[in-house]
């Protein structure tokens, strides 16, 4: 069990803003001169599609604005700029800015293959979580530490310390942060192979949101596509993937698509390679960069051996074969011949030094 109330999953939980007047409300209001910051503001915000930069410019608090730019540069695949903006706030006195900075700094440096720098950011997140759980601090600050640590843990599939259940803190979050929290829960449920349940979380959150939260919605639709692929519902998977693409395209927020390549099991290829060749090439470039850096941390830290010597096409075919797809099903899904599938699998087996499909599981994503 998630420990999440039915009201939350159905989007009925609202923050009781008139209660606990002594506690600070952590929403952001551009008209409010007394700004109280939250981590990952852009990721958790609602804004009009195609107006991301205008939204960032409307933020009056300069540090929060600069961190929002760091988020934008990261989610649009501009990793050097993301590092430049985020590293300015790694040692800031405001914990909310430090949390955002450490998360962006970690992920952006992975894609730049700066593993030592990525480890610095990851270690900062572990330190903040440990302090948050051991010190007497307000619940909202602790909740935000858990929020960021959970995001890093889920997206990287790496240990980030002893993280308490995110569900215990959901009511402390703004609506956008709750949606991101739902993505984390759905992703964890996906990893537990409870695909229908994971999809249900996504559907409930999207249906009950009266605004669009672009970055959160991109990631929610991606995990829904992953769920559908594992239930062999290919057409529905394509619909969710294309929804993620439609949301990401106006502001060029393509990083998340590239990061999820392996888990999307060929959807990027089938939906984008012919129709959007230039965007496809950029997304695959993100995939290669992120995957290479991620494996350099993930494999030694988890004692797992996710394959690092396969092309994106080979990895996709290997993932599908590992999930039980026949050569014919793989060929139809990727619009290639069964002979081509067999040729790719022969290359995969040779590179991984294995002899059959059953051995693939040791080298694939979960």
Predicted feature descriptions by range:
Residues 1-8:
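DNA major-groove recognition helix of helix-turn-helix/homeodomain DNA-binding modules
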Residues 11-31:
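Short, charged recognition helix plus adjacent turn
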Residues 35-53, 71-87, 111-128, 151-167, ...:
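Helix-turn-helix repeat elements of alpha-solenoid scaffolds
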Residues 53-62, 87-98, 123-139, 164-178, ...:
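Solenoid-like repeat scaffolds
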Residues 67, 102-105, 146-147, 182-184, ...:
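TPR/TPR-like alpha-solenoid signature
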Residues 295-346, 350-355, 361-366:
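Helix-turn-helix DNA-binding segment
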């Amino acid at each position: 069990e998630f420990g999440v109330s039915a009201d939350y999953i159905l989007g009925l939980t609202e923050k009781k803003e008139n209660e606990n007047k002594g506690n600070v409300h952590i929403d952001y209001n551009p008209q409010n001169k007394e700004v109280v910051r939250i981590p990952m503001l852009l990721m958790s915000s609602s804004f009009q599609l195609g107006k991301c930069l205008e939204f960032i410019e409307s933020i009056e608090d300069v540090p929060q604005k600069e961190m929002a730019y760091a988020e934008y540069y990261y989610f649009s695949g501009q990793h050097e700029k993301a590092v430049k903006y985020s590293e300015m706030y790694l040692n800031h006195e405001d914990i909310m800015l430090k949390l955002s900075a450490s998360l962006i700094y970690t992920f952006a440096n992975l894609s730049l293959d700066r593993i030592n720098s990525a480890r610095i950011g990851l270690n900062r997140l572990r330190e903040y979580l440990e302090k948050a759980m051991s010190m007497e601090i307000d619940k909202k600050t602790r909740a935000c530490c858990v929020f960021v640590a959970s995001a890093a843990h889920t997206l990287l599939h790496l240990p980030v310390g002893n993280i308490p259940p995110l569900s215990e803190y959901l009511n402390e979050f703004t609506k956008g942060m709750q949606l991101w929290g739902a993505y984390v829960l759905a992703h964890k449920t996906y990893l537990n192979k409870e695909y229908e349940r994971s999809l249900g979380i996504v559907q409930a959150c999207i249906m009950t949101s009266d605004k669009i939260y672009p970055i959160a919605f991109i990631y929610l639709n991606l995990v829904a596509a992953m769920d559908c692929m594992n239930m062999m519902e290919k057409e529905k998977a394509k619909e969710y993937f294309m929804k993620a693409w439609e949301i990401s395209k106006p502001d060029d927020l393509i990083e998340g698509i590239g990061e999820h390549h392996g888990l999307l099991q060929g959807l990027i290829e089938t939906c984008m390679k012919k129709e959007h060749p230039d965007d496809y090439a950029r997304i695959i470039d993100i995939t290669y960069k992120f995957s290479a850096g991620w494996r350099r941390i993930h494999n030694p830290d988890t004692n797992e051996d996710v394959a690092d010597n396969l092309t994106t096409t080979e990895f996709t075919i290997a993932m599908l074969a590992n999930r039980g797809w026949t050569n014919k099903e793989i060929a139809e899904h990727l619009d290639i011949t069964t002979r081509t599938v067999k040729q790719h699998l022969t290359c995969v087996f040779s590179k991984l030094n294995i002899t059959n499909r059953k051995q693939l599981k040791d080298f694939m994503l979960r």
